[in-house]
Structure formats: structure tokens, C-alpha cells
Amino acid sequence: MSFTYEYPRPALTVDCVVFGFDGGGLQVLLIRRALEPFLGSWALPGGFVDMDEDLDQAARRELEEETHLSRVFLEQLFTFGTPGRDPRGRV
């Protein structure tokens, strides 16, 4: 008996919000998007979750790939899932 079936499979993504202090003010780390969609726009570091990793691993990998930051305290704060958030498809 087969347990596979055709069903839409949304992509899973993570974004990281990194706070810092500069002088007396709170700062948020942003990157410039290197690819479409929104090439050159400011964005939070993040990306797609690989099939063999959990969300924490994906967040750490994406943060290091895009900012070269490692050994950073991470905590999941919110989850968003509104359809239409990304022009590439359902995330």
C-alpha cells in the first residue's frame, strides 16, 4: 500500500531578526537581497529550510551564509503563514 499522494507542498522558510545596540540606540541587522524577487531591496537574513534540517539549524545556516555571524543566541518568537507573502509561491 502506497502512502504517497499528490498534495500541494508549501516551501518552508526562516528569517532572522538580529538586534544590536549602537551607542544608545537599538539597531536591526538587514541585508541587501542578491537575487530576485526584490533584487537589491533590504531584507531580514533568511531563506529556505533544507529537507534534512530543523528550523533552528536552518536559521543558523542562513544567518551565517548571509552575514557571517555565528554563535548567536536564537529564539523563535513568531510564526507567519499568510498566503501570498512571497511571489515565488506558498511559504
Pin down the residues of each PLM region.
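Short active-site-proximal "capping" loops at secondary-structure junctions
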Residues: A34-P37, V49, T79-T82
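N-terminal strand-loop-strand
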Residues: S2-A43, R71
